[in-house]
Amino acid sequence: MVVLIKVLQLVLALSILVIIHEFGHFIASRIFGVRVEKFYMFFDTKFSIFRCKKVNGKWYFKFFQKNEPEKYRTIENIDPITKKKSYTYEPIDLATLPEDDWRRAEDTTEFGLGWIPLGGYCKIAGMIDESMDQAQMAQEPKPWEFRTKPAWQRLIIMVGGVFMNVVLAILIYIGLTASCGEQYLSTAEVNKNGITVDSLGYSFGLRDGDKIVSVDGKYIENFHKIPMELILEKTQYIEVERDGRVVKVYLPDDAVRNLLKHQTSFIDFRMPFIIGDVLEGESAEKAGLAVGDRIIKVGDSLTLYFNDFRKQIVNYKSQEVSLTVLRGADTIVMPVAVPESGLIGVRNSMTLNFATKEYSFWQAIPRGFTKTFTEIGDYWKQLKLIFNPSTGAYESLGGFIAIGSIFPDSFQWQQFWRLTALLSIILAVMNILPIPGLDGGHVLFLLYEVVTRRKPSDKFLEKATTIGFIFLLILLIYANGNDIVKLFR
């Protein structure tokens, strides 16, 4: 059930993003008088689940039917000497078609829902794209086609999708900020008890109980942003307060690589172990532990904090151990049977207070812009790490499983929209990369045309697009292959 909930959230988020992205291309095309032949959610190879189109002023709807026949006849030609085949395309006389034949309505758009849930597309007349419509491109250019428009108009059409994804992220962040404000765990709050570190943090030179003073001389207000700060800014040192004095902890040269390979955060906040929940039927309930109890000892070992308890309790797997518990003014010693898993069935209560910043609607507007462009900048930095082999960031590339895993186990509307905004930014940044087959590839060739006043040939664009799609397919296979490999680790 958890997997299904995650999948549904992923599909819903991607559907919203694809529709918004393609709508950006669609509306820009219509503004400049370029016809849009098809607007589809998901891909419709061979047939579609649903489609509709306005023909002669009337809307027609079709369900689970094959795609419409082409508007061109393919004629095969064989060279009498070389025996090589070539093809020419002859337009069908649309006037001879039945009145309700969708091909007659060239000036309207066919909207539909495909059956392959890998995105969607907007088929713009006269444009070399993933459809590779050679029949259309072999005809004389028409005034309503993409290829006949000035370079600046084609440029706006191509960036329309990316622009709409950025706008969507801004609007979502404005809405979330205005309605919910911003909640975060401040570094100052964490410093009340100090941090706890795992083996990686310990290897860096950090210790349990350290209090974060600065990162490369900069104070980080939001505690949970510290790990990403270390990765994106290639931090040299962390200043901590330890035993009443400030200590500089210098990070090793391979810190970024190790952080990227690490599956969990190398630092966490530290809290006293006060039981917040006792799971029914587990060892803790059977032993008589209750909500509000504070565990201060496991056997003879002092466990003032939850991280101390976790380190000690695993030493007693499949054994009985005495826990010293504070219950109100009383100190109680309770024997508890520890199962093989090392988990006795309790959860710690959150005793730290999250900071909340409230925003009015008007204050939320500039905050929405700031947050969006900050996220864009951070994602660019992450991409630079991926293309730098020394960081090993390429090893962490993930596909649909990795994306789906970031959604919560149950639907939480705030978290859903927050992740949708983040994915919208990722889609915008990825699409603007100068790779043929992506919007950025088209933009690259258009900028070349503007600068040189020479338009790349259709043949060159077709080959470049094919190469780009092969590269993207390899990248897709690699990313999703990484996901599958991680499942079996």
Which residue stretches match the model-derived regions?
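Functional transmembrane alpha-helices
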Residues: 2, 137-152, 262-286, 294-297, ...
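Small-residue-rich helix-interface/hinge motifs
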Residues: 3-137, 430-452
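Internal alpha-helical transmembrane segments
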Residues: 9-13, 20, 31, 38, ...
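Transmembrane helix-loop junctions in multipass membrane proteins, especially transporters and channels
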Residues: 30-34, 177-185, 389-393, 484-488
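Primarily interfacial, aromatic-capped hydrophobic alpha-helices that serve as membrane anchors
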Residues: 61-68, 462, 468-486
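PDZ/PDZ-like peptide-tail recognition elements
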Residues: 157-194, 226-277, 322-324, 333-355, ...
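Hydrophobic membrane-targeting alpha-helices
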Residues: 171-179, 428, 432, 476-483
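Conserved PDZ fold ligand-binding element
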Residues: 201-223, 284-306, 464
